UniProtKB/Swiss-Prot annotation:
Cofactor note: Binds 2 magnesium or manganese ions per subunit.
Compositionally biased residues, Polar residues: 471-485
Organism, scientific name: Arabidopsis thaliana
Protein name: Protein phosphatase 2C 32
One Pfam family from the record: PP2C
Tissues showing expression: Expressed in roots, leaves, stems, inflorescences, flowers and throughout the shoot meristem.
Domain comment quoted from the record: The N-terminal domain (1-233) has a regulatory function and inhibits phosphatase activity. The conserved PP2C phosphatase domain (271-833) is interrupted by an insertion of approximately 200 amino acids.
Compositionally skewed regions (Low complexity) per UniProt: 395-407
Gene inactivation effect: Loss-of-function mutant pol-6 (T-DNA insertion) shows suppression of clavata mutant phenotypes. The catalytic activity of POL may be functionally replaced by the activity of PLL1. Pol and pll1 double mutant is seedling lethal.
InterPro entries: PP2C, PPM-type-like_dom_sf, PPM-type_phosphatase-like_dom
Example of a GO cellular component annotation carried by this entry: nucleus
Cofactor(s), names only, from the UniProt record: Mg(2+); Mn(2+)
EC number annotated for this UniProt entry: 3.1.3.16
Description of activity control: Insensitive to okadaic acid.
């Protein structure tokens, strides 16, 4: 219905089973367990605001394309409008290799505030959830919710059915209240849409709330909503605007400054172009952090999984800095930046007035001399009004979020100030038009007097003229000013809460002035373009390693400065797993024991699709696009085990199929494990510390860490960091050489036709799965539930295995509070990147025997 829901509905499994669980959310979803989210890549030629046709999600052999009508193909590069195709091809847009991203995280550790975030430590008004998620609107997410006891889903213990997830996640609006995405040159990192609804998957609330608090909130919010609605009904256009403000306080109203100096609603097309450049997602589960950034136009994908230990500071720091460091290092290797063309820049007479030229006498004389020549008093008054509007914007403060040159996002209290100024504007037109006109005319006729002293300052003259104008609504404006100050305080409190929930978005950048300058430069800065030369893959890997090195140096400097106040920072560290995909090139960098697994189809098992090239395929040429979609949907419905009651999914069938997939698929580990489980790592540490016979103690580095390489963990890298700790946390540090390093392993891989998907995860997944089991289970799940969420399925399987291993039921494990549950499983974050999209016709494309099996 225009909100992009159909784009992600394929991530969710429709449940038509009579035994399915009906979702009746009588209480808010609990976000403390974890999140499941997905991103389905749309066609780069479609508008993000237009619902994509289902036909663009299939792939049919190119022989079925009708070259005259451009129909009969489900490839993404075929569209119905040839002019639209040519128009977008002129921009040189790239076709990315990845098609869909599935992610899920589950927390086992309790949530702890970052040590450097003293405001969060002192705040006790909101309980920080152990898991949270935020993203642009292209991602759909929902908190993990276990099925009620006694309920049984088709595959796992979560209420994951895509229908349910689509319902629970709400409208997939194109906005977000947080501009916390990674900063990028020429591209705004946060959503820039004009819609005013929150993009969270579920409210940040919890199951167990005190009834008295709910009654208090209802008693307070009701009168305030009604009062503010009556006050601003003229501007807001009705109660619904205020209703959305209270339900979604993070949202902002976007405005743009036109050439006339007045505020106008932001152009949806301009927002569309800016928002399509970058999509991002941030997630946390316990001490795990997940960072996803992708660009549809440039054809690249960045995924970072940061598995922290001993505290959240290290993974939060990596979340805030590593992507930006990599982006900087890769300039000139994978992409480059070009300055905006002079044709797109404003002419000198079209430049918006600034704080300097507004007070420049010659500038004002030049502006208003045109109005005198036109001999129009109305034009003169409107010009003065537009000048006042611009002045008011600058006086209000720097723009909150720049969407481009001259654009700003306005919060509610800023709208109140704007309305108060409009009241003064009305008084200007009624009473002070002649006074202001005479003053400005005198300045034009006598330019020599405009530069004399402060008494003749044109800006002072304008302001004094405005102040002397009687305003019939002065008392009304005073009331609105009081309400504006109250709402400003409300906004500041909400911002402090968001700082606690998402510390990586705020706490490392405290100087607002610097951030504002960065945003202004960002909006008018250079534009990223594709690197046209030959890519040096070794240079790319070295650049990624340099980015990690510089990020750790900055973190260690920060820790060293804080040792006297927060010595526990020396204990905190993180494993780092980064995957950068650019077209068909995949670059992987890791330190620690998080893994990146590539699933490849064994060549001797590959089969061509039996539907390709036969009579049925030839018949497709003469059929319309819509009929082809219906044929494919009917075929999927018949072959899917979810809809085919004759082939129910049973445990025995699943185990047999998973075993067969282990023979047909191969797991290739692109990352390297850095832990004491690897003999080479143990030998390396002992050879570097021959004088210390206890460098490896109890299968851990100095008896403390299982990992042999990590980001942070300064107490095992510098003796002074170790000495700053309490004695109970110190180790016997011999010498000055570090026991662990942050030297990463880097790998480049060129994707081939046999590569199917990638699985990136923290080490918690491999406590219960081997690499081959992960690939086999994901392949089985995609084969049987092509619209499902494989990452969430892996999380459910892991929790089920953890419960079985410890002799308890699935729900009994989840009933164990976080912190205590860490005894049974670790924080786990999983990302599954499909390299060919959702496998709608996988039964025919991969294993033809599956089709005959379903038809029995």
């Amino acid at each position: 219905m225009g909100n992009g829901t159909s784009r992600v509905v394929g991530c969710f499994v429709p449940s038509n089973d009579k035994n399915g669980v009906d979702l009746e959310f009588l209480e808010p979803l609990d976000e403390g367990l974890g999140h499941s989210f997905c991103y389905v890549r749309p066609s780069i030629f479609e508008s993000p605001d237009i619902t994509p046709s289902n036909s663009e999600r299939f792939t049919i052999d190119s022989s079925t394309i009708d070259s005259e009508t451009l129909t009969g193909s489900f490839r993404n590069d075929i569209v119905d409008d040839p002019s639209f195709l040519n128009r977008h091809n002129s921009k040189g847009l790239a076709e990315t290799t990845f098609k869909a991203i599935s992610g899920a995280s589950v927390s086992a550790n309790v949530s702890t505030a970052r040590t450097g975030n003293q405001m969060a430590l002192c705040s006790s008004d909101v309980l920080e959830p152990a898991a949270s998620f935020e993203s642009t609107s292209s991602f759909a997410s929902i908190p993990l919710q276990p099925l009620p006891r006694g309920g049984s889903g088709p595959l796992n213990g979560f209420m994951s059915g895509p229908l349910e997830r689509g319902f629970a996640s709400g409208p997939l609006d194109r906005n977000n209240g947080f501009m916390s995405g990674p900063i990028e040159k020429g591209v705004m990192s946060g959503p820039l849409d004009v819609s005013d609804r929150s993009n969270f998957s579920a409210p940040l609330s919890f199951r167990r709330k005190k009834p008295r608090f709910q009654r208090f909130m209802r008693s307070v919010s009701g009168p305030m909503k009604s009062t503010l609605a009556r006050t601003f009904s003229r501007r807001s256009g009705g109660l619904s605007w205020m209703h959305r403000f209270f339900l979604h306080p993070e949202t902002r109203v976007s405005w743009a400054v036109g050439k006339d100096g007045k505020l106008h609603g932001e152009d949806p097309e301009s927002c569309l172009e800016s928002n399509r450049n970058l999509q991002w997602a941030h997630g946390k589960a316990g001490e795990d952090r997940v960072h996803v950034v992708l660009s549809e136009e440039q054809g690249w994908l960045f995924i970072g999984i940061y598995d922290g230990f001993s505290g959240p500071d290290a993974p939060d720091f990596v979340m805030s800095h590593l992507y930006k460091a990599i982006d900087k290092e890769l300039e000139g290797l994978l992409w480059d930046y070009e300055e905006p063309s002079e044709d797109n820049q404003l002419q000198p007479d079209q430049e918006p007035p600034t704080e300097e030229n507004m007070c420049d006498p010659e500038s004002i004389s030049e502006q208003h001399s045109k109005s005198v020549v036109a001999e129009s008093e109305e034009v003169m008054i409107d010009d003065i009004s537009s000048l006042g509007n611009t002045d008011t914007q600058i006086a209000d403060g720097p723009p909150g979020d720049s969407a481009g040159p001259g654009k700003k996002s306005m919060r509610l209290y800023e709208l109140l100030q704007l309305e108060q100024w409009e009241g003064e504007e009305i008084g200007l037109k009624r009473y002070g038009g002649n006074v202001a006109l005479n003053n400005m005319t005198n300045q034009v006729e006598n330019p020599s007097t405009s530069g004399g002293g402060a008494g003749n300052d044109p800006c002072t003259t304008d302001r004094s003229a405005l102040d002397g104008i009687p305003n019939s609504g002065q008392r009304h404006g005073t009331k609105k000013s009081q309400i504006s100050s109250k709402i400003r305080r409300m906004y500041q409190k909400q911002k402090s809460l968001r700082k606690k929930l998402f510390p990586w978005s705020y706490d490392w950048h405290r100087e607002e002035g610097i951030c504002v300058e960065e945003k202004i430069v960002e909006s008018s800065g250079p534009i990223r373009r594709r690197w046209s030369g030959t890519v040096d893959h070794d240079a790319v890997l070295r650049a990624m390693a340099r980015a990690l090195e510089s990020t750790e140096e900055a973190y260690m400097d920060m820790v060293e400065k804080s040792l006297d106040i927060n010595p526990e920072l020396a204990l905190m560290g993180s494993c780092v797993l980064v995957m950068l995909m650019k077209d068909q090139d995949v670059y992987v960098m890791n330190v620690g024991d998080s893994r990146a697994i590539l699933a490849q189809e064994r060549l001797h098992d590959r089969h061509s699709n039996p539907g390709f090239g036969n009579d049925e395929g030839i018949g497709h040429k003469s059929r319309s696009r819509e009929s082809l979609v219906r044929i494919e949907l009917d075929r999927i419905s018949e072959e899917s085990p979810i809809h085919n009651q004759a082939t129910p999914i049973s445990v025995s069938n699943k185990n047999r199929d998973v075993t067969s997939y282990r023979l047909k698929m191969r797991a290739v580990q692109l990352s390297s494990d850095h832990s004491t489980s690897v003999e080479e790592e143990i030998w390396r540490i002992r050879s570097e510390h021959p004088e210390d016979d206890q460098s490896i103690l109890k299968d851990r580095v100095k008896g403390q860490l299982k990992v042999t390489r990590a980001f942070g963990a300064g107490f095992l890298k510098k003796p002074n960091f170790n000495e700053a700790l309490l004695e109970m946390f110190q180790v016997e540090y011999i010498g000055t050489d570090p026991y662990i390093t942050c030297e990463p392993c880097t790998v480049h891989h060129r994707l081939t036709s046999s590569d199917r998907f990638m699985v990136l995860s923290s080490d918690g997944l491999y406590e219960y799965f081997s690499n081959e089991e992960v690939v086999a289970h994901v392949t089985w799940f995609i084969e049987n539930v092509p619209e499902g969420d494989p990452a969430q399925y892996l999380i459910a399987e892991l929790l089920s295995r953890a419960a079985t291993k410890n002799g308890m039921e699935f729900h009994d494990l989840l009933d164990i509070p976080q912190g205590d549950r860490r005894k049974y499983h670790d924080d786990v974050s999983v990302m599954v990147v499909s390299l060919e999209g959702r496998i709608w016709r996988s039964s025919g494309q991969y294993y033809p025997e599956r089709k005959q099996k379903f038809n029995r």
